[in-house]
Each structure stands twice: as C-alpha cells, then as structure tokens.
C-alpha cells in the first residue's frame, strides 16, 4: 500500500519525500545559509571536534524543515544546484537525486541515499537498462538511452514521433546528455537541444554555467543564451536580498558585473560569459519547475 500527500511541488510516498530542486534550494538559501555564513559559524565548522557536532545540529534543523520523520528526500525533475547539494552532503542530510521521464513511467535512475554518489542521478533503476551513446561513456558525454518494461509502447496516434524516440532495438532516446562511471552512476550534463557550440566547435552545456552562476551573490535564477559568438547570461536577481542590503539599480548592476568576472574564473575559456543582463521577472517555468528556456533564446 502506498500512502501519499501532495503539497505544492513536494510529494510524500510512505516515509520518503519527493521534491523538485527549486523547493529544496529555496529552503536552504533562505533559511539555512544566512545562519551559517557568519564568521562564528565558519570558525566552528573549521574546528574538527566541534564541526561534527555543529553539522549534526544543522542536519537536524534541515530535516525538521521537512517534517523530521522521513527515510530520505528524493530530488528530481530539474538540475540540482551543486552548491546546495555539496552542503547537504557535507552535513549528512539524507537525500538522493533521481532521474526519469514521463515516457518511462517515470523512473530511469535511482540510488538509495546510503550509496548515492553526489553529482550523479543514481544508477539504472530496478529492471531498467541505461547506457550512454558515446565511444567513451566515462569521459565523453553522449545521449542517455533507457530500456526496460516501464518504457512506453509509443505516443498515442503518433507513429512518427514514436519512431524518432524509440529505436528499433527498443532503446528510448531521452534527449539528455550525460556520462556514466565504471560503477554505473549516471551524471547528466544537460539537454542535447540546449547544447551550444564554441567558436572552435567545443561543446558548451549552459546548465553547467547556470549552476555556478546561481551560486553567486544575489542571483535567484539564470539562463545562458548564445548571441552570435558570445554567451549572454540572463539573470533574475534576488530582489528581496537586494532590498535588505539597500541596493539600488546601479549597485545591483555592479554586483552582477562582479559575478560575471568571478564566474569566468570558474569555467573554461571557451565558455566565458560576455555579459549579464538583468531579467526583472521570474522566468516562466514548466509544472516541474524547469525554466522554459525556449522563451528566452531570442532576447
């Protein structure tokens, strides 16, 4: 028997919680980070004996924010910010990141939090097979393919779309790019249709740039687009925090320029961002809370 409750973008199944990344990230950024990023807490977290106790306390507080009594939090539906994930892993929070698609009803990859590898989305789920369409799956990203009894038979009355999605050997083509390590852990790079090409043909994954940018000061969310041979980052600022700091339009623009410069020290030269443009409204999203990227590529 499965008992579940649905609230917003979280769902509880038995004693686990399923959530989209946006919900987790907002809780951590708004409720947790401000409490641990002062000088005193930073000092305590660098003292080995005390650090363990402090992290246990932080983990308890984060767990209580989700009700306290659960086996694990399963995160999926969109890319998970690496800064937030690294924090959750460092304090021992019981989470895992899964991967799936409606066409697979919906689970493709999953791993119990006890064996989960940070940065991955788990391994092929029970009865599923997953492979990377690449000559070197561990190092060269390729399309993620899935096969198993839960893969759909096809799209209703759309044979052409079905043939484009499921090949003659029964492999479902996800449209996502990723790698797989020797233990079968899958690491998603981004959507194949989102991939950009650098000036010399390098593959650029905008989701990876956005993940780093979203961890910088006053950035609520972002979309990286290509204009000619330049990469432009559209940023929706954290206006609440900016107001708390009493920052005006000019100061906010200065912060974003500083962010751009810092970002470019964190990424390869061929994927450097030339400009950050402030986007006043929140980006439109799908029901899974993924940004509708196609709406902003023409800006």
Language-model-derived ranges and their functions:
Residues 119-124, 169:
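Short Gly/Pro-enriched turn/cap motifs at secondary-structure boundaries
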Residues 177, 215-239, 264:
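C-terminal boundary motif of the adenylate-forming
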Residues 16-18, 30-116, 129, 220:
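Gly/Ser/Thr-rich phosphate-binding loop
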Residues 1-8, 13:
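Single conserved hydrophobic/aromatic residue that forms the stacking wall/gate
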């Amino acid at each position: 028997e499965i008992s579940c409750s649905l609230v917003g973008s979280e769902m509880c199944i038995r004693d686990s919680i399923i959530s989209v990344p946006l919900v987790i990230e907002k809780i951590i950024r708004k409720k947790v980070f401000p409490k641990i990023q002062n000088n005193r807490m930073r000092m305590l977290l660098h003292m080995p004996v005390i650090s363990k106790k402090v992290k246990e306390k932080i983990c308890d507080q984060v767990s209580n924010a989700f009700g306290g009594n659960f086996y694990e939090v399963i995160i999926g539906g969109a890319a998970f910010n690496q800064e937030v994930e690294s924090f959750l892993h460092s304090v021992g929070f019981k989470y895992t990141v899964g991967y799936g698609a409606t066409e697979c009803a919906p689970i493709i990859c999953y791993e119990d939090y006890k064996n989960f590898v940070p940065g991955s989305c788990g391994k092929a789920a029970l009865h599923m097979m997953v492979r990377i369409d690449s000559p070197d799956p561990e190092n060269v990203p390729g399309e993620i393919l899935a096969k198993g009894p839960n893969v759909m038979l096809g799209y209703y009355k759309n044979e052409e779309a079905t043939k484009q999605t499921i090949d003659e050997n029964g492999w479902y083509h996800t449209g996502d790019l990723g790698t797989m390590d020797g233990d079968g852990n899958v690491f998603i790079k981004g959507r194949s249709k989102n991939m950009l090409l650098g000036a010399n043909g390098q593959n650029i994954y905008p989701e990876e740039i956005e993940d780093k940018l979203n961890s910088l000061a006053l950035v609520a969310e972002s979309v990286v687009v290509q204009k000619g041979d330049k990469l432009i980052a559209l940023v929706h600022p954290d206006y609440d925090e900016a107001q708390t700091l009493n920052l005006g339009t000019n100061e906010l623009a200065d912060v974003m320029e500083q962010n751009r410069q810092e970002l470019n020290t964190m990424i390869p030269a061929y994927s450097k961002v030339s400009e950050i443009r402030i986007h006043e409204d929140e980006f439109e999203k799908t029901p899974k809370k993924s940004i509708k990227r196609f709406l902003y590529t023409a800006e």
